[in-house]
Amino acid sequence: MSVLRSTCLFFPPRSLLISFNKRRLFSTSRLILNKESETTKKKDKSKQQDFNPRHLGVAAEIFIPSAYKNLPNVFAHPLIVANALIRRLYTFGLNSVQVALFRFQSGIKPSFLLWKNKAIETYINVNTSFAHKNLSDIKGLVSLWVQEALEARSRQLPGNATLDWQLIKFNAVPKLVSVQPIMIPGMPLEHLQLVYKFDTKQRLIKVNQQTKKTETLDRDVVDYIAFLCDATTNDMILMGSLFESKPNDKLPKSYEDDAKVAIHRMKVNGDIYRLPPS
């Protein structure tokens, strides 16, 4: 009897076993979930570290409203002018909505004045460095698509001449014409695509090293330059350039679902010194 009693002491009640198994199962599940959570965080962190914003270019068509001076005569083409004005108002409203959505979803207050000043600074640095053939100085300021195009054009510059580029003045206040939030997979909403209109008077000075002859060319230039803006760091990367839409152009779709078309468009828009389409 004493042996049986002592033996029974080694067997806990059934309810205690069930309780113990539940606790063990719960702790094991929690450990697995914690490990999975840590693995997911590490993967997300590695994705963020692998992301390079310089890989992004202008992939989608962007509607740039025609300047008032480029609209046809309202009496000769009233419908075209009316549609152009409607699209201009629609674009203005869409930009306002995009800004509001970005601010709501990201919780970041846009710093438009700072971004405009940094865009101007980047624009000047890129043009100056290209004229001086110092593309290494602006490597972090431009996308890979722009860098590739600048390197190709730099090889076409005359070897026996030195160039200097100067921004004489702005003919009009730089204007933000397009705002589009950029969603990057695996990352919070932090980036914007901003397109600025720069109406400038520029000077290009060319000096022939053999004859020492100097040529000076002054001209008015209107550029529509796209930038990738990191709203958390205020860093600006020049993504490419665009051209003003024609008065009878329709609104394009806001995204490009064909990868080949998107890549081709990023390459074309990366050449900021290309001529406008005829």
Swiss-Prot record:
GO BP, sorted A to Z: inner mitochondrial membrane organization; positive regulation of mitochondrial translation; protein insertion into mitochondrial inner membrane from matrix
Highest rank taxon of the organism: Eukaryota
Keyword Mitochondrion assigned: yes
Subcellular localization, as worded in the UniProt entry: Mitochondrion inner membrane
UniProt xrefs under Pfam families: MBA1
UniProt KW keywords: Membrane, Mitochondrion, Mitochondrion inner membrane, Transit peptide
Topological relation to the membrane, as annotated: Peripheral membrane protein
Phenotype upon loss of function: Leads to a reduced growth rate on non-fermentable carbon sources, which is more pronounced at high temperature. Shows defects in the membrane insertion of nascent chains resulting in the accumulation of the precursor form of subunit 2 of cytochrome oxidase.
Annotated GO CC locations: mitochondrial inner membrane; mitochondrion
GO molecular function: mitochondrial ribosome binding; ribosome binding
Range annotated as the organelle transit peptide: 1-33
Gene3D superfamilies for this protein: 3.10.450.240
Function (record text): Mitochondrial inner membrane-associated mitoribosome receptor that spatially aligns the mitoribosome exit tunnel with the membrane insertion machinery and allows cotranslational protein membrane insertion.
Subunit field text: Interacts with OXA1 and MDM38. Binds to mitoribosomes in order to recruit them to the mitochondrial inner membrane.
Further remark: Present with 2720 molecules/cell in log phase SD medium.
Official protein name in the record: Inner membrane mitoribosome receptor MBA1, mitochondrial
Source taxonomy: Eukaryota, Fungi, Dikarya, Ascomycota, Saccharomycotina
